[in-house]
Curated annotation (Swiss-Prot):
One of its GO terms (biological process) is tRNA N1-guanine methylation. This is tRNA (guanine-N(1)-)-methyltransferase. The gene is trmD. It is found in: Cytoplasm. It comes from the Bacteria.
Length: 232
């Protein structure tokens, strides 16, 4: 099964973007996943190919029209059961758990918002799952979509050279990742922790877990609270 990503956007030239220089780009070349950016404007029906209009009730900015976006969604999703994601700052925060769920599926249809937002009716009528990559505003959904794809594709089977690479990363097991060290042994008066060169793998694993736990307590206590709540 090949992971298939279909991206609805007003800027298809932004894809694959920086992904072509990463593991995701190499995997794309090898056919381990596919990417199909679709121009939303192609589904506009007026002579100006309009995709947006002023917000009902007044206000700043423009809103992506429901008829145009719905036509684009319908075109790419006939008989398609892939999740439909809308990159949106008001969406549910993207988590590593959701990334794993997406990677286990056969792909996703990703809608990149623009302007002030997307007409709420098309969100409801087409069952769009709003997804956020953080509590900040971007100029459009394209950078967010690329971030999501990077997170998903890198954990697809066979993409990382060592399938264990993803096991010890941040958010796996509900913890931030432990610190890393490499040669030289001594650098600017700072030594690699002796435990890491001891050859005692059980002790190394214990040290790494303790470090990950301490970092998580210091920087992201909310992750620990979430993990504790899920295990109750």
């Amino acid at each position: 099964m090949t992971f298939k990503a279909t991206v609805l956007t007003l800027y298809p030239e932004m894809f694959p973007g920086h992904l072509q220089y990463s593991l995701a780009g190499k995997a794309l070349e090898r056919g381990q996943w596919s990417l199909d950016p679709i121009q939303i404007r192609e589904f506009a029906t007026d002579r100006h190919r309009s995709v947006d209009d002023t917000p009902a009730g007044g206000g700043a900015g423009m809103v992506l029209k429901p008829d145009v976006l719905a036509a684009a969604i319908d075109h790419v999703s006939k008989g398609d059961t892939r999740p439909r994601l809308l990159m949106s700052p008001r969406g549910k925060p993207l988590s590593q758990n959701r990334v794993r769920e997406l990677a286990a599926g056969d792909g996703a249809i990703i809608v990149c918002g623009r302007f002030e937002g997307v007409d709420q009716r098309v969100i409801e009528a087409r069952g769009l799952e709003e997804v956020s990559i953080g509590d900040y505003i971007l100029s459009g959904g394209e950078p967010a979509a690329l971030t999501l794809l990077d997170a998903v594709v890198r954990i697809l089977p066979g993409v990382m050279g060592n399938d264990l690479s993803g096991v010890h990363e941040s958010f796996e097991g509900g913890l931030l990742e432990h610190p890393h060290y490499t040669r030289p042994q001594l650098w600017e008066g700072r030594d690699i922790p002796a435990i890491l060169t001891s050859g005692n793998h059980a002790a190394i694993d214990k040290w790494r877990h303790e470090q990950a736990l301490a970092l998580t307590k210091e920087r992201r206590p909310d992750l620990l609270e979430k993990t504790q709540a899920e295990t109750k």
